[in-house]
Curated annotation (Swiss-Prot):
Biased composition annotated in UniProt, kind: Low complexity: 827-838
Record carries keyword Metal-binding: no
Organism: Emericella nidulans (strain FGSC A4 / ATCC 38163 / CBS 112.46 / NRRL 194 / M139) (Aspergillus nidulans)
Renumbered residue ranges of the record's region Disordered: 1-51, 485-515, 822-841, 873-909
Role of this protein: Beta-glucosidases are one of a number of cellulolytic enzymes involved in the degradation of cellulosic biomass. Catalyzes the last step releasing glucose from the inhibitory cellobiose.
Keyword Hydrolase applies: yes
The protein, known as: Probable beta-glucosidase E
């Protein structure tokens, strides 16, 4: 009997085992059987078999190879053909050739396992992979070139120069109401070291704070300036415990209620302060909603620049009333999720949003200008490019428009990894780099940090610019009174008291640093929501209720009765249908709400929060009726006709979700694929409405407009409510409107078209790249949303500003009063700076050991430091001998300041009131209610500008534009006198030729009414 066979791989560490089908194993078995026929067991006992390796002590593979016997080595290397050929039983060399080939394969495998270059050279898998990669790359290039050849006309269309430049960056501290803060800041900054200045401008890196999404890299400890905590977001405090999940921005915009907008902002600000947050990353006013399918439209307030601006201003006032810095984001033209970030979609470049100067000013800049008038402390620049220049280094946008023309006094921070260069972004107007990491997440390599220290020393970034960056940040801190903040109760230390990365009380101090295990108390579980009737749930519920828009109500089916007339023989039967009507497996079941499960109360992405609780519609409906009512839930989107036919009332819940591009859910990659209901919602409504024994009421929870054409005209669909994204009080707020506890007073913050095409070619998301740098053309941007419908005579299903009420209204006695006599065509001359900005020593400090890591300094992996490892490349360049005069005599080129500037939000004369509109509003119905009075302006029909020596250019305008609104509450029969004003800017257009706002000297027409197409009052006005 042959000696027992020990497989070769039994003595190799587990990770180095051969596969079960390894051919070398099979060959050894064959040879073993062959040898056993010519040798007896006795003969084999005295010498080791070449087929059975000795017992090995070492498990290291290379040691194992070195310990092979000579016979084993000869077999494995196949170095002596005649030794193998002796085993040839066929005698014709065929078997020998096969064995040589087989042993050569074994040799390659063994050498491949030795590591190093041999592992690569002898690895068949590696070579196969290389071939596949080369073929794939070839196909990719071929396909890309083929696509390019078919789309050449489009590529050529975008072969355009970049934007105008604006240098140097205007200094902050030129407006009187910021003067005191800048004076304090300058005294602090002039005492800072270079290291401290850089430290303030650069984030510490992703997950490098113990408590927050991000903490600005270390404090300026020597002068007492703290680290600052920046935290999302637009509808509450992201990642935090014991906070309120407020209704989303789109719901807030649908209230058209300035007071509620401010209350919501104040509550968010108070919760941020109690949680130790210095800067809240909201409100969002970009995207504006040019593309109705845009993934993050729901974070903003609606698809109109004036509505968006009013809501943003009220939110900012609310947040900053509690001493927390608000952030106006995303600046600017961040209108879709596809291709907004480099590398996120497999393309190395972010898309470019291409926009003309007039549309930029009149549409997309409008909310930002108003936010700056409201003294917003921070502006966040966006990921995308604008006219082929990254938004976070676009000097025209940051220096020219934001800091010069609009007079922004706060600081510009990058969106997380939106910074794409070091020196260019500093010179272009960026003041703070977030999260500190450079071109890739959590790699510990910053474009600023130590590189900004080096750039300041070698004068690539002038000290004048660095000092302004730091001063802007510190001045904003003083402006909000954060120098006098008390420590958060009960035992805070002035910093954030919650963790973004764990729900446990104790956790890692630097969770983003591999290998660091230092721990700290990271969660103090401080309740910031408020208690009882003063709790913030009450504000959330009011906003959610007033954000519900009633768009259809046949026969007054709503409001519902809590005591419906029951059939004498059976109880009143109510069916509740749809997954959206019930709870999910948990309100926070998906990270950043990245799934559509259960009732939809917010979209997904970084603009979300953790629900402390979520009242679903079915939860609220359980105790809604007072009489004998039998309610049966069918919380699924597939129902049978038999489930509906015996019901006296059918409530159908459907939705449409979207969010940020880093999450994909249900086949939606950020931006919606279309405007239809999701998860079979259209079929569900059709099935229920055509079979229900009574009226069908449809409730739509959606991130924006949805196409309702498949079912809106069905006789069974008697009421429809757009409930938007209502937050934690979803079900309770819905019942307030369903049963008439409050009036249906929401109004659409967008237009509901009959198809996606109704919104125009410029409103379509770019789903496939059309160039190496994807290009999105906003040539129709002046005609956003309802303006496009009006210009092209398209009948929408429901127009912008539309919404039904439970009562009736009448508008009368419209009167226009001139507040200025013969106002000039152009605004007044730009006023000089009210105060001089701070001045510092412009010379860089000496490059010495003060900028190096201190001796014995403990360096955390991936943490962003301002220190340099060496003094390499810190020497300023020598002066140019050909330049005349000394270096200090040389003055850099300075772009001429804008005539449209001179104050917060622009030239102060732009905001002088030129007209007042008075009217009387009466509630002529039988119920108390609320009404939104909307004021629209039509510009003169013929406005021309000189475009040359002889020719004149006709200036085109939208049919009418929203310019003001107010919301009132009246009892039955009650009257109220209402007035609204218009400013010079409201009646001006942006002249590209004159680079200023121009007031046409011809007849305007002012409209007053209930929506963009229901305007019963109107009068001409000649300024």
């Amino acid at each position: 009997m042959p000696k027992s066979y020990t497989p070769v791989h039994d003595s190799i560490p587990e990770e180095d085992h051969f596969s079960s089908d390894d051919e070398s194993n099979f060959r050894l078995h064959r040879i073993d059987r062959s040898a056993s026929r010519s040798q007896s067991p006795k003969e084999n006992e005295g010498e080791p078999s070449i087929l059975a390796p000795l017992v090995r002590k070492s498990t290291d593979f290379e040691t194992y190879l070195d310990s092979l016997t000579e016979d084993e080595q000869q077999l494995l290397s196949a170095s002596k053909d005649h030794d193998i050929e002796d085993l040839d039983r066929f005698g014709d060399g065929t078997a020998a050739a096969r064995r040589r080939f087989s042993e050569s394969k074994k040799r390659r495998k063994l050498l491949a396992k030795r590591g190093g270059w041999r592992a690569v050279y002898y690895s068949k898998t590696w070579w196969r992979t290389l071939v596949v990669v080369i073929i794939a790359l070839g196909l990719l290039v071929w396909g890309f070139l083929k696509y390019a050849s078919t789309r050449g006309d489009i590529w050529e269309e975008y072969d355009m120069p970049g934007p105008d430049s604006y240098f140097p960056t205007p200094k902050g501290g030129t407006l009187k109401h910021w003067a005191e803060s800048y004076e304090k800041a300058s005294k602090l900054v002039e005492r800072m070291t270079l290291i401290e200045k850089v430290n303030i401008t650069t984030g510490t890196g992703w997950q490098m704070g113990i408590n927050s999404k991000l903490t600005i890299s270390g404090p300026a400890a020597l002068v007492g300036f703290p680290s600052l905590c920046l935290q999302d977001g637009p509808l509450g405090i992201r990642f935090a415990d014991h906070i309120t999940a407020f209704p989303a921005g789109i719901t807030t915009g649908a209230t058209w209620n300035r007071d509620l907008m401010r209350q919501r902002g104040a509550a968010i600000g108070l919760e941020a302060r109690l949680k130790g947050v210095n800067v809240i990353l909201g409100p969002s006013m970009g995207p504006l909603g040019m593309m109705p399918a845009g993934g993050r439209n729901w974070e903003g307030f609606g698809s109109d620049p004036v509505l968006q601006a009013v809501a943003a201003v009220e939110t900012i006032h609310g947040i900053q009333s509690n001493g927390v810095m608000a952030t106006a984001k995303h600046y600017i033209m961040n209108e879709q999720e596809h291709f907004r970030q480099p590398n996120e979609w497999g393309i190395p470049y972010a898309l470019s949003s291409n926009i003309d100067d007039r549309a930029l000013h009149e549409v997309f800049l409008w909310p930002f200008a108003e936010s700056i008038r409201a003294d917003v402390a921070s502006v966040m620049c966006s990921y995308n490019q604008v006219n082929n220049s990254h938004a976070c280094e676009n000097s025209k946008l940051l220096n020219g428009i934001l800091k010069d023309e609009l007079g922004f006094q706060g600081f510009v921070q990058s969106d997380w990894l939106a910074q794409r260069s070091g020196v260019n972004s500093a010179l272009g107007g960026l003041d703070m780099s977030m999260p500190g990491d450079g071109l890739h997440w959590a790699d510990g390599r910053s474009l600023w940090g130590s590189e900004l220290t080096r750039a300041a020393l070698n004068t690539s970034v002038p000290m004048e610019r660095l000092n302004d960056m730091v001063t802007r940040i510190v001045a904003a801190w003083y402006q909000l009174g954060q120098d006098s903040w008390e420590s958060p109760a009960p035992d805070g230390d002035g910093g954030p008291n919650f963790s973004s990365w764990t729900d446990d009380e104790f956790g890692f101090r630097y969770p983003g640093s591999p290998g660091d295990t230092s721990a700290a108390r990271v969660n103090r579980f401080i309740d910031a929501q408020g208690r009882g009737e003063e709790g913030h749930w009450n504000i959330a519920r009011k906003v959610a209720a007033e954000g519900i828009v009633l768009v259809k109500n046949v026969g007054g089916v709503l409001p519902l009765s809590r005591s419906p007339r029951a059939n004498a023989e059976r109880p009143y039967r109510v069916g509740v249908y749809g997954d959206d009507g019930g709870p999910a497996a948990g309100p926070n079941i998906c990270t950043d709400r990245g799934c559509n499960s259960g009732t939809l109360a917010m979209g997904w992405g970084s603009g979300t929060v953790e629900f402390p609780y979520l009242i679903s519609p079915i939860d609220a409906l359980q105790g809604a009726w007072q009489s004998d009512v039998q309610m049966t839930p069918y919380l699924r989107n597939a129902v049978m006709p038999a489930d509906t036919s015996d019901k006296d009332l059918c409530l159908v819940f459907v939705n449409a979700d979207s969010g940020e591009g880093y999450i994909s859910a249900g086949g939606i990659h950020g931006d919606r694929n279309n405007l239809f209901l999701q998860k079979g919602g259209d079929t569900l409504v059709h099935t229920v409405a055509t079979n229900c024994g009574g009226p069908t009421v449809v409730v739509v929870h959606a991130v924006g407009p949805v196409i309702v054409e498949p079912w809106i005209d069905l006789p069974g669909v008697q009421a429809v409510l757009f409930a938007h994204l209502p937050g934690e009080e979803s079900g309770n707020a819905l019942l307030d409107v369903l049963f008439g506890d409050v009036d249906a007073s929401g109004r659409l913050p967008y237009t509901v078209g009959k198809s996606l095409e109704d919104y125009g070619p410029g409103a379509q998301v770019l789903y496939e790249p059309n160039a190496p740098v994807p290009q999105v053309d906003f040539s129709d941007a002046l005609y956003i949303d309802h303006r496009y419908f009006d210009r092209n005579n398209i009948n929408p299903r429901y127009e912008f500003g539309f919404g039904l009420s439970y009562t009736k209204w009448e508008l009368t006695n419209m009167k226009i009063t001139r507040l200025q006599r013969n106002p000039s065509r152009l605004p007044a001359a730009r006023p000089p700076d009210a105060v001089a900005p701070p001045s510092y020593d412009a010379n860089p400090p000496l490059a010495n050991e003060s900028v190096l890591f201190p001796p014995g300094f403990r360096i955390l992996s991936k943490y962003i430091y301002p220190y340099l490892p060496t003094l390499e490349a810190t020497t300023p360049p020598p002066p140019n001998p050909e330049a005349s005069g000394s270096a200090t005599d040389q003055k850099p080129h300075r772009t001429k300041p804008s005539d449209a500037g001179g104050g917060a939000g622009g030239n102060p004369s732009l905001y002088e009131e030129v007209a007042r509109i008075d009217l009387t509003v009466q509630n002529t119905g039988t119920r108390s209610g609320q009404q939104v009075i909307q004021l629209y302006v039509s510009f003169p029909h013929t406005v021309t500008e000189s475009s040359g020596q002889k020719s004149h250019e006709n200036i085109d305008f939208p049919d009418r534009v929203l310019r003001n609104f107010t919301k009132i509450s009246l009892a039955p029969g009650q009257k109220m006198d209402v007035n609204m004003t218009l400013t010079r800017k409201d009646l001006s257009y942006w002249s590209v030729r004159e680079q200023n706002w121009v007031l046409p000297k011809d007849e305007f027409y002012f409209w007053v009414g209930y929506s963009s197409r229901n305007l019963p009052l109107g009068k001409p006005f000649d300024p």
